[in-house]
Amino acid sequence: MSITPERKQTLVKEYAQKSGDTGSPEVQVAILTERIVNLTEHFKTHVKDNHSRRGLLKMVSQRRQLLDYVKNRDEPRYKSLIERLGIRR
């Protein structure tokens, strides 16, 4: 269910704005998206796992807040981010 450190590093390198950037909204959204995808796969086999479902909903909410922040600050950056991540919004 969690992301391996190697996968997290590749996400940080791919979405970082500059070298050493681990906290930008783009990086945070990319990591949250990866975790959301993993949990969605988990729920295909564990339908009744409601405790993890709550965590999923919190992650989706956090990602939504970060995406709204990016959209309010810089809309072209927001559009490129959701396109790169494949988020349907």
Curated annotation (Swiss-Prot):
- A GO molecular-function descriptor: rRNA binding
- Tell me, which GO biological process terms does this entry list? translation
Show the Gene3D superfamilies listed in the entry.
6.10.250.3130, S15/NS1, RNA-binding
Q: Does the keyword Secreted apply?
A: no
Gene Ontology CC: cytosolic small ribosomal subunit
- Is Ribonucleoprotein tagged as a keyword? yes
Matching InterPro entries, A to Z? Answer: Ribosomal_uS15 (IPR000589), Ribosomal_uS15_bac-type (IPR005290), uS15_NS1_RNA-bd_sf (IPR009068)
- Which key words are in the record? Ribonucleoprotein, Ribosomal protein, RNA-binding, rRNA-binding
Q: How does it assemble?
A: Part of the 30S ribosomal subunit. Forms a bridge to the 50S subunit in the 70S ribosome, contacting the 23S rRNA.
Query: What role is this protein assigned?
Result: One of the primary rRNA binding proteins, it binds directly to 16S rRNA where it helps nucleate assembly of the platform of the 30S subunit by binding and bridging several RNA helices of the 16S rRNA. Forms an intersubunit bridge (bridge B4) with the 23S rRNA of the 50S subunit in the ribosome.
The family database entries (HAMAP family) matched by this protein are listed as: Ribosomal_uS15_B
Give the UniProt family note: Belongs to the universal ribosomal protein uS15 family.
Q: Indicate what this protein is called per its UniProt record.
A: Small ribosomal subunit protein uS15
Biological source species = Methylocella silvestris (strain DSM 15510 / CIP 108128 / LMG 27833 / NCIMB 13906 / BL2)
